[in-house]
Amino acid sequence: MLLKELSSLASPLSQPQVEKLKQLTAELNAVQLAWVSGYLAATANASGNLAQLAPVSDAPAAQTVTILYGSQTGNGRGIAKALAEKAKAQGYSVNLASMGEYNVRQLKQETLLLLVVSTHGEGEAPDDAIELHKFLASKRAPQLNNLHYSVLALGDSSYEFFCQTGKDFDARLSALGAKALLPLVECDVDYEAAAGQWHADVLTAVKPLIQTTANVVALNDTGSAQVASESEFTKQNPYSAEVLVSQKITGRGSDRDVRHVEIDLGESGLRYEVGDALGVWFSNNETLVDEILAGLGLAADATVTVGNESINLKQALIEKKELTQLYPGLVKAWAELSASPELLAISEDKEQVRQFILHHQFADLVANYQLKADANLDANKLVELLRPLTPRLYSIASSQSEVDTEVHLTVALVEDEHQGQARFGGASHFLASAEEGAEVKVYVEPNKHFRLPEDPQTPVIMIGPGTGVAPFRAFMQERVAQGAEGDSWLFFGNPHFEQDFLYQTEWQQYLKNGDLTRIDVAFSRDQAHKIYVQHRIKEQGQTLWQWLQNGAHLYICGDAERMAKDVHQALLAVAVEFGGLSSEAAEEYFETLRSHKRYQKDVY
């Protein structure tokens, strides 16, 4: 078979590995190819580990449980890894892998498949699940009559397409003849208990189908090598760091309060790569908690049980419970507790619920929808009703190549007003209010889907309006530290030049030094007609297209609901106008860039 005809379906390689192999060998002549072929064969024979390198599925199928995960953050991988460890303890042979590294050619050989997958954006598969998701939906997908499977879907019920990717996998596997071990398990943001129950249930369901003759977990997991060197500080065990700076970087006349926050990681040993996020645990505002307690007529010192801990109600609401983000289940529950005709009507309409939760918090439910007389909502029932507090993720705005043990964030203070009452975002208000020396509990959340090119000479195009510019500040610090010679281009936008040009002097210095090749800005309200970054992209379309043809990597960070979609449409228009592509071919072009890791998004 010719190398140019090679695909993951006809080799033991995944598609990303195939593409990398093609790229590495494209410039070799026949003599060089022959030498490389001989060298690799000799290396493989010398290792004496050919049997060890064979896919786990080459073992008798009934002996192996394959566990695949697809997740934008590390939650899915953590659930899958914990399941693999439990399966090992029960004597099972396990193949654990990211969906992005899994060779779909193996699928028809599987007999036991357990999937953990999240949903990203508006019902979209996370980056590492896209290829498998597409394959299962295609005509190439085989019949899977010998397969037993189970799917754990991760999602956030405050979004319309809750757990959609998991639903897609479940439906498609069933349509291909596979048999479900359990009904689809849908997990909200407080997924820990449901995931733990799934672990127990699915291993019980697997037991009659497998012989426990193996006792080794085969980790076909690109992240497994990294696990050994990870910091002891995690989401479950965060590091208590010190706030060094929380400085407003928008002007006095701006209607936006954006903070530059610097945090000292001290001697924690925490390491991050540019593109990663910082998880921030926060406490709810005490004044907000007092308002809720007064509105419900509940005593602050009432004893409640949260998990295995007995604490007073006020402490539980400050430290343990989500108060600033509503979700559909809570709106529906409160509608029933209040018997409010208005809220009941809202709770029955998905779009009305979606709009309602964007502009209301739990305190608004308490203030505006009084409980009916027989609601009987006591302190313990209240904490059961509210879902657990979860950390917020912020794109890291620094490189440790420059700031060493510090980590920098760009935080927009979330502010809203409802019936004259100001409401603030939980984490953003916590960070904005933090004084020098204050403690904040943090951990690093890796994002392998938002990485600079391995070759510093590769050009990069960075599109980051508003606080979406944060990771590109980190990118530039890293590129300077690398001595990168590749061109770099930033698109930035915000309402006003004088008030909202985040990190203006830094960008100007990068331009002056030649580290940043060019910058195009869009200040939407500095003229009669609004101008956004997507307009600048179209204006510079010919040059942008040439950069892409020269191998540039393309990055987008910021708002997923509107900005990222508008920017994508602008990029498609550029490909049509300046690349001469049809609309369908333009979509395929950017899909190819994405699969080659040349088109990456960090959107939220």
Curated annotation (Swiss-Prot):
Catalytic activity as recorded in UniProt: hydrogen sulfide + 3 NADP(+) + 3 H2O = sulfite + 3 NADPH + 4 H(+)
GO biological process, one term: hydrogen sulfide biosynthetic process
Binding site for FMN: 71-76, 118-121, 154-163
Enzyme class: oxidoreductase
Binding site residues for NADP(+): 524-525, 530-534, 566
Domain Flavodoxin-like: 65-203
Cofactor note: Binds 1 FAD per subunit.
EC number, UniProt record: 1.8.1.2
Keyword tags: Amino-acid biosynthesis, Cysteine biosynthesis, Electron transport, FAD, Flavoprotein, FMN, NADP, Oxidoreductase, Transport
Subunit architecture: Alpha(8)-beta(8). The alpha component is a flavoprotein, the beta component is a hemoprotein.
Record-stated family: Belongs to the NADPH-dependent sulphite reductase flavoprotein subunit CysJ family.
The protein's name in its UniProt record: Sulfite reductase [NADPH] flavoprotein alpha-component
Organism of derivation: Shewanella sp. (strain ANA-3)
Gene name tied to this protein: cysJ
